[in-house]
Amino acid sequence: MNQPLQHITVLLDEAVDALLDGAAQPVAGQWVDATFGRGGHSRRILQRLGPDGALLAFDKDPDAIEEAARITDARFSIRHEGFRHLSELPAGSVQGVLMDLGVSSPQIDNPERGFSFRFEGPLDMRMDTTRGQSVADWLAEADAQQIAEVIRDYGEERFAGPIAKAIVARRESQGPLRNTAELAELVAGAVRTREAGQNPATRTFQALRIFINAELEELEQALEASLRVLAPGGRLVVISFHSLEDRIVKQFIAKHSKEVYDRRAPFAVPTPMRLEALGRIKPSEAEVAANARSRSAVMRVARRTGVPA
C-alpha cells in the first residue's frame, strides 16, 4: 500500500497575501479560516497577525480538530462545525474569510476514510465521522433514479444511469456495497468509454462525496454568511478544485459585484454592489510541478463594500 502523503497547502502565500491585502505589518482584527484542514493557512495567518489579531477556524473533521489542538497560540480558536456556521458571527465583525474547499491529502490517502478508489477501505466519505450517513448506508437504500441523479449532478458523469443500475443490481443479487474497491470495480464495469489519464471511478467518487457531505449547499450558505459578517473592506478568498465549486463562487461574486436593477420599476434606485471582484489566481507552474494536486485549483478574491447585506 502507498504511504499516506503529507498535506501540502495550495496557494499558501497567495491566499494569505490576498486575505490580508498584502499587509507588511502585523494586522489586528478578527479573521476566519473557514476550512482548517491541516492548518497550513491558519499557521501562516497567525504569523502575520499582531497581538490584537484573532483567528477563528472551522472544520467538520475530527482529525482536523485534533491537529488544531497542537496550536497553542491564544489568538487562535476552532469550532468543530461546518463553515455554514459563519452565519452565527456578528454582522460586520470579520476582516477576512478564507475558504479552501475540497478534501486534504491526509483524508484522501487514509483508506479508513473511504474517499479514494486507490485504497480499499470502508465506503464512508463523511467529512465528520461522528455524525451523519455514510455513502455505504445511503447506497444501501437509495433507488436507481436517486443514485443516477447524484452521480450526474455532482460528478458530471455521462454514464450515471448505467452506474446506478449496476449498483442496484449488485445490491439485489449480492447485498449492499461496503468498501471502496467493490464500488470502483463496479463503476469500471459500467463505464463504456474511458477518459485518458482518469480512473473511471473518479467522477462517481467525487459525486458521492459531495452529496453525502452536502458540500455545495454548505458552500452557498457560507458565501451568503460571509457577505453579512465581513466588515467594509474585508476580504473574501476562496480556493476551489473543481468546476462545480468554482461556478458557485464565480456566480456569487459576479451577482454581488454589480448594481441590480428592478426591471419592474425602471426608475427605482438600483441595489448597489456589495462585493468588488479582485480577480482569480491559478497555481504557478512551479507549484504544480511540486504538488500535482494543485493543478486544478482556482482562487477567487473579492472585497466587501460598505453596502449592508
Swiss-Prot record:
Record family assignment: Belongs to the methyltransferase superfamily. RsmH family.
PANTHER family in the record: 12S RRNA N4-METHYLCYTIDINE METHYLTRANSFERASE, S-ADENOSYL-METHYLTRANSFERASE MRAW
EC number(s) given by UniProt: 2.1.1.199
Role description: Specifically methylates the N4 position of cytidine in position 1402 (C1402) of 16S rRNA.
The gene coding this protein: rsmH
GO-annotated biological processes: rRNA base methylation
Primary residence: cytoplasm
Chemical reaction(s) catalysed: cytidine(1402) in 16S rRNA + S-adenosyl-L-methionine = N(4)-methylcytidine(1402) in 16S rRNA + S-adenosyl-L-homocysteine + H(+)
Cellular localisation: Cytoplasm
One Gene Ontology cellular component annotation held by this UniProt entry: cytoplasm
Name under which the protein is recorded: Ribosomal RNA small subunit methyltransferase H
Tagged with keyword Acetylation: no
The organism's taxonomic lineage, starting at the top: Bacteria, Pseudomonadati, Pseudomonadota, Betaproteobacteria, Burkholderiales
Residues holding S-adenosyl-L-methionine: 39-41, 59, 83, 100, 107
GO molecular function term, any single one: rRNA (cytosine-N4-)-methyltransferase activity
